[in-house]
Regions:
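Acidic, glycine/proline-rich low-complexity segments that act as flexible tails and inter-domain linkers
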Residues: 1-181
Length: 181
């Protein structure tokens, strides 16, 4: 079930470097006007990619979108310093209608994990079940993680969901030792 083989988009990759980390290392987007990547720009790139308005080398891959939107959803539950910035809130509010219209169902699920999502395979159902917990910052047990990894290694799970699971589980397990370096 591999999606597109596009990307990664460099600007979205820069945004991911800032937001796809744990609760102590995340750097919200758009805190300053001089930040290298602004949340509006990232969402514009993602939407242009979804509409196929970018060149192939500038498009955002399904996996990249999955990781980004999972990270943003998880960050809603982070401590205040690493939770969403006012610029992120404003950008998501501004583009909410377009995101709803142009994002595939798996991305909408990552944005709103309490909504219904219809898995297309048993393996994807395993991953979606785990993501419902991961996106709420809950930890998977060793056995649950093993089961999810086996499902991800098949070619029967959408790339966005694979990336969301890996990034999300990683973000939830940031340790204090990592923060110290």
């Amino acid at each position: 079930m591999s999606g597109n083989s596009l990307g990664p988009n460099a600007d979205v990759l820069e945004a991911q470097a800032r937001v796809c980390t744990g609760p102590h290392q995340t750097r919200p987007l758009g805190v300053k006007d001089t930040d290298p990547v602004q949340p509006e720009t990232v969402l514009e790139i993602i939407l242009k990619s979804a509409k196929r308005e970018l060149s192939i080398d500038q498009m955002v891959s399904d996996a990249q979108m999955g990781a980004f939107f999972a990270a943003m959803t998880i960050r809603k539950h982070f401590p205040p310093d690493t939770r969403w910035s006012q610029s992120e809130i404003a950008a998501f509010d501004k583009y909410a209608p377009d995101l709803t219209e142009f994002m595939p169902p798996e991305i909408e699920f990552l944005r709103y994990p309490d909504t219904a999502y219809c898995s297309s395979t048993p393996e994807e159902n395993i991953v979606v079940g785990a993501l419902k917990r991961i996106l709420k910052r809950e930890h998977l047990t060793y056995g649950e993680t093993l089961k999810v990894c086996k499902a991800i290694l098949t070619n029967r799970v959408k790339d966005a969901l694979k990336a969301a699971t890996l990034i999300g589980q990683r973000m939830n397990l940031e340790s204090y030792d990592e923060v110290l370096g």
